[in-house]
Protein backbone atom coordinates (compact mmCIF):
# COMPACT_ATOMS: atom_id res chain seq x y z
CA UNK A 1 0.00 0.00 0.00
CA UNK A 2 1.23 3.56 -0.70
CA UNK A 3 0.64 4.54 2.90
CA UNK A 4 2.81 1.67 4.11
CA UNK A 5 5.63 2.75 1.80
CA UNK A 6 5.56 6.33 3.07
CA UNK A 7 5.81 5.20 6.67
CA UNK A 8 9.35 3.98 5.96
CA UNK A 9 10.47 7.62 5.65
CA UNK A 10 11.00 9.65 8.81
CA UNK A 11 8.24 12.28 9.13
CA UNK A 12 10.53 15.25 9.77
CA UNK A 13 12.83 14.12 6.95
CA UNK A 14 9.99 13.97 4.47
CA UNK A 15 8.72 17.43 5.51
CA UNK A 16 12.21 18.86 4.97
CA UNK A 17 12.58 17.09 1.61
CA UNK A 18 9.18 18.25 0.37
CA UNK A 19 9.99 21.82 1.40
CA UNK A 20 13.33 21.74 -0.41
CA UNK A 21 11.91 20.02 -3.50
CA UNK A 22 9.40 22.83 -3.94
CA UNK A 23 12.31 25.22 -4.58
CA UNK A 24 14.35 23.10 -6.99
CA UNK A 25 14.34 23.38 -10.82
CA UNK A 26 13.69 20.77 -13.53
CA UNK A 27 16.75 19.29 -15.17
CA UNK A 28 19.42 20.56 -12.74
CA UNK A 29 21.73 18.73 -10.42
CA UNK A 30 19.00 19.00 -7.76
CA UNK A 31 15.99 18.47 -10.06
CA UNK A 32 12.40 17.65 -9.16
CA UNK A 33 10.66 14.56 -10.40
CA UNK A 34 8.99 15.07 -13.80
CA UNK A 35 5.96 17.38 -13.49
CA UNK A 36 3.93 15.05 -15.66
CA UNK A 37 4.20 12.26 -13.10
CA UNK A 38 0.79 12.13 -11.43
CA UNK A 39 1.59 9.75 -8.59
CA UNK A 40 3.28 10.78 -5.37
CA UNK A 41 7.02 10.01 -5.41
CA UNK A 42 7.99 6.74 -3.80
CA UNK A 43 10.53 6.20 -1.02
CA UNK A 44 13.42 5.60 -3.45
CA UNK A 45 12.86 8.99 -5.13
CA UNK A 46 12.55 10.75 -1.79
CA UNK A 47 15.77 9.10 -0.66
CA UNK A 48 17.54 10.24 -3.84
CA UNK A 49 16.45 13.87 -3.46
CA UNK A 50 17.22 13.76 0.26
CA UNK A 51 20.74 12.51 -0.55
CA UNK A 52 21.29 15.32 -3.04
CA UNK A 53 20.18 17.93 -0.55
CA UNK A 54 22.46 16.37 2.05
CA UNK A 55 25.33 16.62 -0.45
CA UNK A 56 24.65 20.34 -0.98
CA UNK A 57 24.43 20.84 2.76
CA UNK A 58 27.75 19.01 3.24
CA UNK A 59 29.44 21.22 0.61
CA UNK A 60 28.08 24.26 2.44
CA UNK A 61 29.45 23.03 5.77
CA UNK A 62 32.83 22.11 4.22
CA UNK A 63 33.19 25.54 2.64
CA UNK A 64 32.15 27.22 5.88
CA UNK A 65 34.70 25.14 7.78
CA UNK A 66 37.48 26.19 5.39
CA UNK A 67 36.54 29.85 5.70
CA UNK A 68 36.48 29.62 9.50
CA UNK A 69 39.80 27.77 9.52
CA UNK A 70 41.34 30.53 7.42
CA UNK A 71 40.00 33.12 9.83
CA UNK A 72 41.10 31.29 12.99
CA UNK A 73 44.61 30.74 11.62
CA UNK A 74 44.92 34.36 10.56
CA UNK A 75 43.69 35.69 13.91
CA UNK A 76 46.21 33.58 15.85
CA UNK A 77 49.16 34.16 13.48
CA UNK A 78 48.97 37.83 12.57
CA UNK A 79 52.76 38.13 12.35
CA UNK A 80 53.06 35.15 9.99
CA UNK A 81 51.79 34.60 6.46
CA UNK A 82 48.09 33.65 6.82
CA UNK A 83 46.47 30.72 5.03
CA UNK A 84 44.84 31.36 1.67
CA UNK A 85 41.37 32.88 1.78
CA UNK A 86 38.53 31.33 -0.23
CA UNK A 87 36.43 33.31 -2.72
CA UNK A 88 33.72 31.96 -5.02
CA UNK A 89 32.91 33.51 -8.40
CA UNK A 90 30.22 32.72 -10.98
CA UNK A 91 31.83 32.80 -14.44
CA UNK A 92 29.97 32.60 -17.73
CA UNK A 93 30.43 29.25 -19.46
CA UNK A 94 29.63 27.82 -22.89
CA UNK A 95 30.45 24.59 -24.69
CA UNK A 96 32.48 25.18 -27.85
CA UNK A 97 33.46 23.00 -30.77
CA UNK A 98 35.41 19.86 -29.98
CA UNK A 99 33.93 19.65 -26.49
CA UNK A 100 35.95 22.60 -25.17
CA UNK A 101 34.55 24.63 -22.28
CA UNK A 102 34.96 28.40 -22.59
CA UNK A 103 34.93 30.43 -19.36
CA UNK A 104 34.50 34.19 -19.17
CA UNK A 105 35.45 35.82 -15.84
CA UNK A 106 34.51 39.46 -15.38
CA UNK A 107 37.32 41.59 -13.96
CA UNK A 108 34.74 43.45 -11.86
CA UNK A 109 34.06 40.19 -9.99
CA UNK A 110 37.71 39.53 -9.13
CA UNK A 111 38.66 39.99 -5.45
CA UNK A 112 40.69 42.99 -4.36
CA UNK A 113 44.40 42.48 -5.02
CA UNK A 114 43.98 40.63 -8.32
CA UNK A 115 45.31 40.64 -10.98
CA UNK A 116 48.41 39.55 -9.13
CA UNK A 117 49.13 36.03 -10.31
CA UNK A 118 51.31 35.43 -7.25
CA UNK A 119 48.26 35.83 -4.98
CA UNK A 120 46.42 32.94 -6.64
CA UNK A 121 47.14 29.77 -4.65
CA UNK A 122 44.57 27.49 -6.30
CA UNK A 123 41.55 27.72 -8.61
CA UNK A 124 38.89 25.02 -8.97
CA UNK A 125 36.03 25.06 -11.49
CA UNK A 126 32.70 23.19 -11.21
CA UNK A 127 29.70 23.22 -13.53
CA UNK A 128 27.42 23.55 -10.49
CA UNK A 129 27.79 23.88 -6.69
CA UNK A 130 26.78 20.22 -6.27
CA UNK A 131 28.92 18.76 -9.09
CA UNK A 132 31.19 15.96 -7.89
CA UNK A 133 33.79 16.68 -10.60
CA UNK A 134 36.03 19.75 -10.53
CA UNK A 135 38.84 21.05 -12.75
CA UNK A 136 42.03 22.57 -11.41
CA UNK A 137 42.42 25.73 -13.51
CA UNK A 138 45.17 27.32 -11.41
CA UNK A 139 47.85 27.37 -14.13
CA UNK A 140 45.73 28.77 -16.99
CA UNK A 141 44.18 31.38 -14.72
CA UNK A 142 47.60 32.48 -13.45
CA UNK A 143 48.72 32.79 -17.06
CA UNK A 144 45.70 34.94 -17.90
CA UNK A 145 46.31 37.16 -14.88
CA UNK A 146 49.94 37.62 -15.95
CA UNK A 147 49.33 38.23 -19.67
CA UNK A 148 45.93 39.89 -19.95
CA UNK A 149 45.78 43.66 -20.39
CA UNK A 150 44.64 45.42 -17.18
CA UNK A 151 41.99 47.36 -19.13
CA UNK A 152 40.44 44.18 -20.56
CA UNK A 153 36.91 43.76 -19.12
CA UNK A 154 37.20 39.99 -18.71
CA UNK A 155 39.54 36.99 -18.57
CA UNK A 156 38.95 34.03 -20.89
CA UNK A 157 39.85 30.40 -20.20
CA UNK A 158 39.44 27.34 -22.44
CA UNK A 159 39.25 23.91 -20.81
CA UNK A 160 39.82 20.65 -22.66
CA UNK A 161 38.10 17.85 -20.72
CA UNK A 162 38.71 14.20 -21.69
CA UNK A 163 36.73 13.05 -24.77
CA UNK A 164 34.86 10.50 -22.64
CA UNK A 165 33.24 13.39 -20.73
CA UNK A 166 32.15 15.49 -23.71
CA UNK A 167 28.63 14.02 -23.98
CA UNK A 168 27.98 14.53 -20.30
CA UNK A 169 29.28 18.10 -20.45
CA UNK A 170 27.01 18.83 -23.39
CA UNK A 171 24.02 17.66 -21.34
CA UNK A 172 25.07 19.51 -18.18
CA UNK A 173 26.15 22.80 -19.79
CA UNK A 174 22.57 23.81 -20.70
CA UNK A 175 21.54 23.88 -17.03
CA UNK A 176 24.94 24.71 -15.52
CA UNK A 177 25.33 27.05 -12.56
CA UNK A 178 29.13 27.36 -12.83
CA UNK A 179 31.30 28.05 -9.82
CA UNK A 180 34.95 29.11 -9.68
CA UNK A 181 36.55 28.61 -6.27
CA UNK A 182 39.64 30.78 -5.72
CA UNK A 183 42.14 30.23 -2.92
CA UNK A 184 44.09 33.47 -2.47
CA UNK A 185 47.28 34.27 -0.63
CA UNK A 186 46.92 37.41 1.53
CA UNK A 187 48.46 40.71 0.57
CA UNK A 188 51.83 41.50 2.11
CA UNK A 189 52.31 43.37 5.39
CA UNK A 190 48.77 42.72 6.55
CA UNK A 191 49.85 41.49 9.99
CA UNK A 192 52.07 44.53 10.52
CA UNK A 193 49.19 46.88 9.69
CA UNK A 194 47.02 45.09 12.24
CA UNK A 195 49.72 45.33 14.90
CA UNK A 196 49.96 49.08 14.33
CA UNK A 197 46.17 49.34 14.58
CA UNK A 198 46.10 47.49 17.91
CA UNK A 199 48.73 49.83 19.33
CA UNK A 200 46.34 52.77 18.87
CA UNK A 201 43.31 51.10 20.45
CA UNK A 202 43.33 52.94 23.78
CA UNK A 203 40.02 54.84 23.90
CA UNK A 204 40.33 58.26 25.58
CA UNK A 205 36.55 58.40 26.07
CA UNK A 206 36.40 55.27 28.21
CA UNK A 207 36.02 51.53 27.59
CA UNK A 208 33.52 50.56 24.92
CA UNK A 209 32.82 54.10 23.67
CA UNK A 210 35.24 54.39 20.75
CA UNK A 211 35.09 52.82 17.31
CA UNK A 212 34.89 49.06 17.76
CA UNK A 213 33.41 45.82 16.47
CA UNK A 214 29.90 45.00 17.72
CA UNK A 215 27.89 41.80 17.21
CA UNK A 216 24.11 41.53 16.87
CA UNK A 217 22.24 38.23 16.57
CA UNK A 218 19.61 38.41 13.83
CA UNK A 219 17.19 35.92 12.27
CA UNK A 220 16.44 35.71 8.55
CA UNK A 221 13.09 37.33 9.30
CA UNK A 222 14.85 40.26 11.02
CA UNK A 223 17.01 40.78 7.93
CA UNK A 224 14.17 40.34 5.43
CA UNK A 225 15.93 37.31 3.90
CA UNK A 226 13.48 34.56 4.83
CA UNK A 227 12.03 34.32 1.32
CA UNK A 228 15.36 33.62 -0.46
CA UNK A 229 17.93 32.32 2.07
CA UNK A 230 17.69 28.71 3.29
CA UNK A 231 20.69 28.56 5.63
CA UNK A 232 21.92 29.69 8.09
CA UNK A 233 18.64 30.49 9.84
CA UNK A 234 20.39 32.92 12.20
CA UNK A 235 23.29 35.30 11.55
CA UNK A 236 25.81 36.83 13.94
CA UNK A 237 26.04 40.24 12.26
CA UNK A 238 29.27 42.08 13.05
CA UNK A 239 29.27 45.84 12.54
CA UNK A 240 31.29 48.93 13.45
CA UNK A 241 29.97 51.38 16.04
CA UNK A 242 31.38 54.04 18.36
CA UNK A 243 32.99 57.46 18.34
CA UNK A 244 36.17 58.51 16.54
CA UNK A 245 38.19 60.81 18.82
CA UNK A 246 41.42 62.40 17.66
CA UNK A 247 44.02 59.93 16.31
CA UNK A 248 41.92 56.90 17.28
CA UNK A 249 42.17 54.22 14.55
CA UNK A 250 42.55 56.86 11.86
CA UNK A 251 42.46 55.09 8.50
CA UNK A 252 44.65 57.63 6.70
CA UNK A 253 45.91 61.21 6.73
CA UNK A 254 42.56 62.43 5.44
CA UNK A 255 40.87 61.10 8.59
CA UNK A 256 43.43 62.87 10.78
CA UNK A 257 42.93 66.18 8.95
CA UNK A 258 39.17 65.73 9.18
CA UNK A 259 39.45 65.31 12.96
CA UNK A 260 41.49 68.51 13.29
CA UNK A 261 39.10 70.53 11.12
CA UNK A 262 36.09 69.15 12.98
CA UNK A 263 37.50 70.55 16.23
CA UNK A 264 37.90 73.97 14.59
CA UNK A 265 34.70 74.02 12.51
CA UNK A 266 32.23 71.49 13.93
CA UNK A 267 29.30 73.08 12.07
CA UNK A 268 30.82 72.57 8.62
CA UNK A 269 33.19 69.59 8.98
CA UNK A 270 31.69 66.34 10.34
CA UNK A 271 33.65 64.05 12.63
CA UNK A 272 35.21 60.90 11.16
CA UNK A 273 32.92 57.86 11.03
CA UNK A 274 33.54 54.36 12.35
CA UNK A 275 33.37 51.99 9.36
CA UNK A 276 34.64 48.48 8.47
CA UNK A 277 38.33 48.24 7.57
CA UNK A 278 37.98 44.65 6.34
CA UNK A 279 35.36 41.93 6.12
CA UNK A 280 34.85 38.26 6.87
CA UNK A 281 33.27 36.20 4.08
CA UNK A 282 29.89 34.61 4.72
CA UNK A 283 28.41 31.59 2.92
CA UNK A 284 24.66 31.32 2.30
CA UNK A 285 22.52 28.54 0.85
CA UNK A 286 20.02 30.53 -1.19
CA UNK A 287 17.20 30.05 -3.65
CA UNK A 288 17.81 31.14 -7.24
CA UNK A 289 15.75 31.25 -10.42
CA UNK A 290 17.13 27.83 -11.33
CA UNK A 291 17.17 26.10 -7.95
CA UNK A 292 19.45 26.20 -4.90
CA UNK A 293 23.06 27.38 -4.79
CA UNK A 294 25.94 28.28 -2.48
CA UNK A 295 27.00 31.91 -2.53
CA UNK A 296 29.87 33.62 -0.72
CA UNK A 297 29.48 37.31 0.20
CA UNK A 298 32.78 39.07 0.82
CA UNK A 299 31.52 42.38 2.23
CA UNK A 300 28.71 41.42 4.58
CA UNK A 301 30.32 40.92 8.01
CA UNK A 302 32.75 43.50 9.40
CA UNK A 303 36.07 42.09 10.61
CA UNK A 304 38.01 45.19 11.71
CA UNK A 305 36.99 48.81 12.20
CA UNK A 306 38.67 52.15 11.64
CA UNK A 307 37.77 55.84 11.44
CA UNK A 308 37.50 57.64 8.13
Swiss-Prot record:
Which SUPFAM superfamilies does the entry mention? Cystine-knot cytokines
User: Where, by tissue, is this protein expressed?
Assistant: Detected in plasma (at protein level). Highly expressed in placenta, with lower levels in prostate and colon and some expression in kidney.
Q: Which family does it belong to?
A: Belongs to the TGF-beta family.
GO terms for biological process, alphabetical: cell-cell signaling; cellular response to chemical stress; GDF15-GFRAL signaling pathway; negative regulation of appetite; negative regulation of growth hormone receptor signaling pathway; negative regulation of leukocyte migration; negative regulation of multicellular organism growth; negative regulation of SMAD protein signal transduction
Q: What ranges does the record list as Polar residues composition bias? A: 165-177
Looking up Pfam families in the UniProt record yields: TGF_beta (PF00019)
* Noted disease: Hyperemesis gravidarum: An autosomal dominant condition characterized by severe nausea and vomiting in pregnancy. It occurs in up to 2% of pregnancies and leads to significant weight loss, dehydration, electrolyte imbalance, and ketonuria. It is associated with both maternal and fetal morbidity.
Instruction: Give any GO molecular function from the UniProt entry.
Output: protein homodimerization activity
Which positions make up the signal peptide? 1-29
What residues does the annotated propeptide cover? 30-194
Main localisation, per the record? secreted
Q: Which GO terms describe its cellular component?
A: cytoplasm; extracellular exosome; extracellular region; extracellular space; Golgi apparatus; nucleus
What Gene3D superfamilies does its record include? Cystine-knot cytokines
This molecule's function is given as: Hormone produced in response to various stresses to confer information about those stresses to the brain, and trigger an aversive response, characterized by nausea, vomiting, and/or loss of appetite. The aversive response is both required to reduce continuing exposure to those stresses at the time of exposure and to promote avoidance behavior in the future. Acts by binding to its receptor, GFRAL, activating GFRAL-expressing neurons localized in the area postrema and nucleus tractus solitarius of the brainstem.
The protein depicted here goes by the name Growth/differentiation factor 15
Q: What is the effect of changing residue 225 to A?
A: No effect on interaction with GFRAL. Attenuates GDF15-mediated food-intake inhibition
Sorted keywords for this record are: Cleavage on pair of basic residues, Cytokine, Disease variant, Disulfide bond, Glycoprotein, Hormone, Secreted, Signal
Taxonomic lineage of the native organism: Eukaryota, Metazoa, Chordata, Craniata, Vertebrata
Q: What else is known?
A: GDF15 was initially considered as a promising factor for the treatment of obesity due to its ability of GDF15 to reduce appetite and promote weight loss. However, while activation of the GDF15-GFRAL signaling pathway is efficient to reduce obesity and promote weight loss in mouse, it only has limited effect in human.
Q: Where is this region: Disordered?
A: 152-177
* Species annotation: Homo sapiens
Subcellular location field: Secreted
Amino acid sequence: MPGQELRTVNGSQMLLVLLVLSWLPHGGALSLAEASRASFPGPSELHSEDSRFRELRKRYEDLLTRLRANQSWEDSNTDLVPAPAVRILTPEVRLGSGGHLHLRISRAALPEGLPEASRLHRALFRLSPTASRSWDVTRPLRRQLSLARPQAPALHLRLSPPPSQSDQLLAESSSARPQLELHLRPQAARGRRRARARNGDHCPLGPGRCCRLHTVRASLEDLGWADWVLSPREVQVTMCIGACPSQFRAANMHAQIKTSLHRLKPDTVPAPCCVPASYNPMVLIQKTDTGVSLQTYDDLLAKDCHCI
